[in-house]
Amino acid sequence: RVHKVLIAEDVYYPGESETKEFYMSVLLNRGKGRNMIMYSTEGGMDIEEVAEHTPHLIFTEEIDPAVGLQGFQARRIAFNLGLSGNAFKEMVKFIDSLYNAYIGSDASMFEINPVLKTSDDKILAVDAKVNIDDNALYRQKAYADMRDIREENPIEVEAKEVGLNYVDLDGTVGCMVNGAGLAMATMDLIKYAG
């Protein structure tokens, strides 16, 4: 059942044969404690399918959170996507804006698929999926207003209302802990033990 629909402007560009679609996302690489831009020349399709059949077409750029995205990194991404001239410059600006939006919104993931290069070398985000960290919604009032708790796990919502952090997991094993670090370590040990 649909409870809320957000509407965005439709984009039409003539000369579709001269357009090119890319994939790009910004997310946290938890293993390395760094943000990462994942990108591919194969936009407009399911990235999991690309990863399974043609993993060599997916690239990553790790970003040190202490210094943020550097200009050379954005240029390397645009170069690896095969762009040149004005399209190259526009993609560098797009990547910088995308990363700043990711950081500024306290997102855990920003995925644009496809990123469209138009026939006149403009770069557009045609479709996006964004996950905002629930724990940052107090800082992100504009996004908090868009939140639809009917789309969330009702048990997790109820726990949050009484000041508890609750994560609903698959299976039959439960874990009650008093900190995120202990929770992660305990879950890792349970998984390791089988």
Model-derived regions: residue spans:
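ATP-dependent carboxylate/acyl-activation modules
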Residues: R1-H3, D10-I112, L116-G194
